[in-house]
């Protein structure tokens, strides 16, 4: 399974920082890894687009089978817009819709990218200067994820 974006998963990196602040050890794993040198008690899975539902389902099944005792959390655009698709198939999954306010103002844990081949040479930061949007395009997900025109 390939993460379909050239950019790293910013939401997961912010959640990683949030978990580290609670004294939890955090690892970033890309795709379906068969050999992990740790046993997680929480697993976070994200999606960038709704059409990426299949890789999300594959990740849920794969990691739940490997770590049946771990809490599985799914967020991102797919989980926000279509939570019932996940909950109907995987009732054990905790769904998060929208932004995680506790993690919103944290700096992402970019240093975790060093262990992932695709991003090991990542030397950039991603900055959001506003949230929301003043436009009301019928196809756009931004108002559902980030709200209306607050700060835009």
Model-derived features: positions:
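A short, structured N-terminal alpha-helical element that caps or precedes a catalytic domain
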Residues: 1-93
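Short, flexible active-site-adjacent loop segments at beta-strand->alpha-helix junctions, enriched
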Residues: 49, 78, 99-101, 133
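Short catalytic/ligand-binding loop motif for oxyanion handling, primarily in non-cytosolic enzymes
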Residues: 52-53, 80-84, 103-107, 136, ...
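A short acidic Gly-Thr/Ser loop motif
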Residues: 88-91, 101, 130-132
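A charged, well-structured terminal subsegment
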Residues: 97-119
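Radical SAM [4Fe-4S] cluster-binding motif and immediate context
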Residues: 117-152
């Amino acid at each position: 399974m390939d993460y379909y974006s050239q950019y790293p998963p910013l939401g997961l990196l912010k959640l990683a920082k949030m978990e580290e602040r609670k004294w939890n050890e955090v690892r970033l794993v890309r795709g379906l890894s068969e050999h992990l040198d740790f046993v997680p008690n929480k697993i976070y899975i994200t999606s960038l687009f709704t059409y990426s539902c299949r890789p999300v389902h594959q990740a849920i099944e794969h990691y739940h089978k490997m770590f049946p005792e771990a809490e599985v959390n799914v967020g991102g655009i797919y989980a926000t817009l279509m939570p019932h698709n996940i909950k109907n198939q995987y009732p054990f999954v905790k769904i998060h819709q929208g932004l995680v306010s506790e993690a919103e103002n944290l700096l992402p844990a970019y240093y975790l990218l060093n262990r992932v081949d695709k991003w090991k040479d990542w030397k950039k930061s991603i900055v959001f200067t506003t949230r929301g949007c003043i436009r009301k395009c019928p196809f756009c997900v931004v108002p559902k994820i980030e709200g209306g025109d607050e700060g835009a």
